[in-house]
């Protein structure tokens, strides 16, 4: 029966070992994501007719980097592994164990954007609209890092593309990390960057990002394996879905308000 399904490629999570220092693929994916965001952000700044400078983008992405790292790790620990943290507080600093939470990273980025907007005397929603289209590609790379780490795999299935993950008991499972890489990474990236090709009401780009990510994450959660630390099969929705619902609702509200204010200003 196992011959009917794909075998996990079993890539070493450590890309490079230099003495006691280990360079993990997961970390490389995050660095590539930030590198791409920096390249695209500076390119957009140069074409912004002076609205943004490269120096301002540098400051925004530097603050955003720390917002993602600190918020993402703290969010992962407090949303999903708080019991483990109570037993082993140093677990918080072992990023390669358990990884990062998107929802925590989002909160960290919001704090970074608030701080940067204040320093640059800029409207918060203008900052949020600028950074939102830069994020999805890095999210997709992060999910590929999860795949390489043999973590966050999906539920048992008999679909032809099911993969037998070693840490998943070599049972055929949905490669849900790759589903997220495609939807939250590539698809959302093209949606947002297509949307901004025309001038849009301030705040609407950030709102669309929240709606898009929330919807895609909510859908993929139906294919991800339940986390026994926070969910059981009897639960109606998962922790990830519960955290995504406010994003969807909030994003819709932001878009409606943005278009309403834009309409009033043009009347």
Swiss-Prot record:
Residues that span the membrane, as ranges: 21-41, 60-80, 95-115, 203-223, 240-260
Subcellular location: Cell inner membrane
E.C. designation(s): 2.5.1.145
Disulfide partners: none
GO CC annotation terms, alphabetical: plasma membrane
Presence of the UniProt keyword Metal-binding in the record: no
Pfam families xref list: LGT (PF01790)
GO molecular function, one term: phosphatidylglycerol-prolipoprotein diacylglyceryl transferase activity
Residues at which a 1,2-diacyl-sn-glycero-3-phospho-(1'-sn-glycerol) binds: 143
One example of a Gene Ontology biological process annotation: lipoprotein biosynthetic process
InterPro entries membership: Lgt
Keyword annotations: Cell inner membrane, Cell membrane, Membrane, Transferase, Transmembrane, Transmembrane helix
Entry function: Catalyzes the transfer of the diacylglyceryl group from phosphatidylglycerol to the sulfhydryl group of the N-terminal cysteine of a prolipoprotein, the first step in the formation of mature lipoproteins.
PANTHER family: PHOSPHATIDYLGLYCEROL--PROLIPOPROTEIN DIACYLGLYCERYL TRANSFERASE (PTHR30589:SF0), PROLIPOPROTEIN DIACYLGLYCERYL TRANSFERASE (PTHR30589)
Protein family per UniProt: Belongs to the Lgt family.
Protein name: Phosphatidylglycerol--prolipoprotein diacylglyceryl transferase
């Amino acid at each position: 029966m196992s011959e009917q399904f794909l075998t996990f490629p079993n890539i070493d999570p450590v890309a490079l070992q230099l003495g006691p220092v280990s360079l993990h693929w997961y970390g490389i994916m995050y660095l590539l994501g930030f590198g791409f965001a920096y390249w695209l952000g500076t390119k957009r700044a140069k074409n912004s007719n002076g609205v943004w400078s490269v120096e301002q983008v540098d400051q925004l992405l530097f603050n955003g980097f720390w917002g993602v790292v600190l918020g993402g790790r703290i969010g992962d620990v407090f949303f999903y592994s708080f019991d483990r943290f109570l037993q082993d507080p140093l677990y918080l600093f072992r990023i390669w164990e358990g990884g990062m939470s998107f929802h925590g990273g989002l909160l960290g980025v919001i704090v970074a954007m608030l701080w940067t907007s204040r320093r640059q005397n800029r409207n918060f929603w203008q900052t949020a609209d600028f950074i939102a289209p830069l994020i999805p590609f890095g999210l997709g790379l992060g999910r590929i890092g999860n795949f390489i780490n043999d973590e966050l795999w999906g539920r048992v299935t008999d679909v032809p593309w099911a993969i037998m993950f070693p840490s998943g008991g070599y049972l055929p499972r949905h490669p849900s990390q790759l589903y997220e890489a495609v939807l939250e990474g590539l698809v959302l990236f093209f949606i947002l960057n297509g949307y901004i090709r025309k001038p849009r009401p301030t705040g609407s780009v950030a709102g669309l990002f929240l709606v898009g990510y929330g919807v895609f994450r909510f859908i993929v959660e139906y294919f991800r394996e339940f986390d026994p630390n926070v969910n059981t099969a009897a639960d109606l929705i998962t922790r990830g879905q519960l955290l995504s619902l406010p994003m969807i609702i909030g994003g819709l509200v932001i878009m409606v308000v943005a278009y309403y204010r834009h309409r009033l200003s043009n009347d």
